[in-house]
Swiss-Prot record:
GO terms for biological process: ribosome biogenesis. This is GTPase Der. Residues 166-195, 454-493 are annotated as: Disordered. It comes from Pseudomonas aeruginosa (strain UCBPP-PA14). Residues 167-184 have a biased composition (Acidic residues). The keyword GTP-binding applies.
Length: 493
């Protein structure tokens, strides 16, 4: 399972800077989409081929009311459920009362914590270690988050406590290294996860109806094969069958057995939600139609997009809304969810079951789109047609040339395009190619990623050896050139 690391510390110690450094937020895929908020508190990060989740828990002021009063409930919960904590302190400011309170809280929870002394670019690291040694959390790891100093050593220590069994074993984001023979029909890339059917994570903000939807999907006319507790913080993996198709629901709210179902205020868990997204094949994102699109929805959708999961959106509590309210909500969806316009949107009532059955068709189509592979000839043909309709722009008087394309991975589909001057391809043209591939290949519910590779000169670095005749000719030319230069000098005298 993907490890979760929480960033903890008082305000202005550099947590956001470190978060951006680890998740590469400014360069993230999600930043290229209009309408998507970039102010996120959690994100996916990679280091030396390993994937992990980072959570910024927010600042802790540590006044007389104490840590529990000043930390938001979600921050405390994130610390409790995280696999490890990076506790940031400010080397320039020195140790404060707030630092001592946070350290005491972490010691009481017996949480695996790493003390991180930030802003050591102008401070002696040894002095910083000595300054914060009374906190009782071991030697501080010195870093300068703004400049990237010490980050590799910090990650080596923090990630070194986790086994190297990341998500690739689940068949996620797998490369499509086997070439499809020319003329073959597109095929699905099988993965170990298919044994229990399509894994579906139902996520969303608190009290949007996730529990009701889970109960509805596991309700009448469904056969629950068995209930099995997952290994990650009480998340439940529930395989079930519908119309002779196998599915596995990843339920972050716990099992609700028949006869014991009751509605209660959900305790939202960021950690469970993010890990459910990572482990799923398809995400059903539940929103409250009466509240419309809120910032928290955009944050979670941004993480889904960043991880590349197939996506289906369900607008719950649609029944009972007036026609004018429905029209307004649809307008807001079109305006604010442009960055996930590939996802099917369903208007449902989980309580009454209206529209719930249609979710399965979208789940199957999204999964099929995410794991299908196509031959190079097919992808190249689509590229050539797209270039013929709309050519890439000119750069320094030369037009960008896109030569051929092949599949570089699946779930989500990764299309690798080779050509010249590919570093100068505008984002708008990349979006044009994405839409073209989506339309021609009839892809639904999955993001597409396009990667460019520049053409390599086959003669670069190679040097032909001269023949004996060429060597003699070169010598004669050099001798003739020297004699001519000598005559010119003699005439000047």
């Amino acid at each position: 399972m993907v490890p979760v690391i929480a960033l903890v510390g008082r305000p202005n110690v550099g947590k956001s800077t470190l978060f951006n450094r680890l998740t590469k937020s400014r360069d993230a895929i999600v930043a290229e989409y209009a309408g998507l908020t970039r102010d996120r508190q959690y994100g996916e990060a990679r280091w030396q081929g390993r994937t992990y989740i980072v959570i910024d828990t927010g600042g802790i002021s540590g006044d007389e009311e104490g840590i529990d009063a000043k930390m938001a409930e979600q921050s405390l919960q994130a610390i409790e459920e995280a696999d490890a904590v990076l506790f940031l302190v400010d080397s320039r400011a020195g140790m404060t009362a707030a630092d001592q309170m946070i350290a005491e809280h972490l010691r009481k929870r017996n949480k695996r914590s790493f003390l991180i002394a930030n802003k050591v670019d102008t401070i002696d690291p040894d002095l910083a270690r000595a300054e914060f040694s009374p906190l009782g959390l071991g030697d501080a790891l010195p870093i300068a988050a703004a400049h990237g100093r010490g980050i590799n050593h910090m990650l080596q220590e923090a990630l070194g406590i986790f086994p190297k069994d990341n998500a690739e074993e689940e068949g996620e984001g797998e490369p499509a290294s086997e070439e499809v023979a020319e003329g073959e029909e597109p095929t699905r890339i099988p993965g170990p996860s298919e044994k229990d059917g399509i894994k579906i994570a139902i996520i969303g903000r608190p009290n949007v109806g996730k529990s009701t939807l889970v109960n509805r999907m596991l309700g009448e006319e469904r056969v629950i094969v068995y209930d099995q507790a997952g290994t990650t913080r009480d998340s439940i993996y529930i395989p079930f069958e519908r119309n002779e198709e196998m599915y596995t629901l990843i339920d972050t709210a716990g099992v609700r057995r028949r006869g014991k179902i009751f509605e209660a205020v959900e305790k939202f868990s960021v950690v469970k939600t993010l890990q459910a997204i990572q482990d799923a094949n398809v995400v059903i994102f539940v929103m409250d139609a009466r509240e419309g699109v809120v910032e928290h929805d955009l944050n979670l959708l941004g993480f889904v997009l960043e991880t590349g999961r197939a996506l289906v959106i369900a607008l719950n509590k649609w029944d009972g809304m007036e026609a004018a309210e429905r029209d307004y909500v649809k307008t807001e969806l079109e305006r604010r969810l442009l960055f996930v316009d590939f996802a099917d949107i369903h208007f449902i009532s989980a309580l009454h079951g209206t529209g719930v059955g249609h979710l399965y068709k979208s789940v199957q189509e999204s999964f099929r789109s995410a794991v299908t592979r196509w031959p190079t000839s097919r992808l190249t043909s689509i590229l050539e047609d797209a270039v013929q309709v709309h050519q890439p722009p000119m750069v320094n008087g030369r037009r960008i040339k896109l030569r051929y394309a092949h599949l570089g991975g699946a779930n989500p589909p990764l299309i690798v395009i080779h050509g010249n001057q590919v570093d100068a391809v505008p984002k708008a043209y990349t979006r044009y190619l994405e839409k073209t591939y989506r339309r021609v290949l009839k892809l639904v519910g999955t993001p597409i990623r396009i990667e460019y590779k520049g053409g390599e000169n086959p003669y670069e670095g190679k040097k032909n050896s001269l023949t004996a005749r060429q060597v003699n000719k070169k010598r004669r030319l050099m001798s003739h050139h020297k004699k001519a230069e000598k005559k010119k000098k003699d005439k000047r005298r």
